[in-house]
């Protein structure tokens, strides 16, 4: 998961210890004007309100470099050829663009799949963004159509995502 870390992450532990003097304080969304639920002496943004999961500042270049170095190591050591990005709907779109550029530089075949629970999938998938994504909206519609013979959900989802015109799936891709 690239948008948050646990409270035990080494860079966050450094911030807990050194506060303002930590070189990692800008790796997170922190305010020294408040206090966390854990009485850290500063407030920080937790992922979707879960303060045991500290949200990373994905716009900070050092955070991006750290993540990209991890990906490079995984590719070199384990031979990975793609990533499934958990909670991709929470990722900063500029970060996704930077991630795609980095991964393309590793290998033109490196594949990025994002977990998207809701929203406009087209904002996350395409040239310079993710290659593909999970589509739970259509999954639910397909499940209902197959198991309860309810075609309304899948019809609604497909029309909402792709529009009523024929061949919409191929728009701009020929």
Regions found by a protein language model. Give the residues of each.
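An alpha-helix initiation/capping motif
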Residues: 89-97
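The substrate-binding groove and active-site-proximal loops of carbohydrate-active enzymes
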Residues: 49-64, 81-90, 142-148
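A cross-domain feature marking catalytic cores of carbohydrate-active enzymes
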Residues: 1, 5, 87-89, 114-116
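Conserved alpha/beta catalytic core and glycan-binding cleft of carbohydrate-active enzymes
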Residues: 6-19, 45, 71-72, 96, ...
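Short linear motifs at secondary-structure transitions and domain/linker junctions
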Residues: 30-34, 40-42, 87-90, 110-111, ...
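The start of beta-strands in P-loop NTPase/AAA+ ATPase cores
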Residues: 79-81, 110
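Substrate-binding/active-site clefts of carbohydrate-active enzymes
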Residues: 1-72, 77, 102-105, 122-123
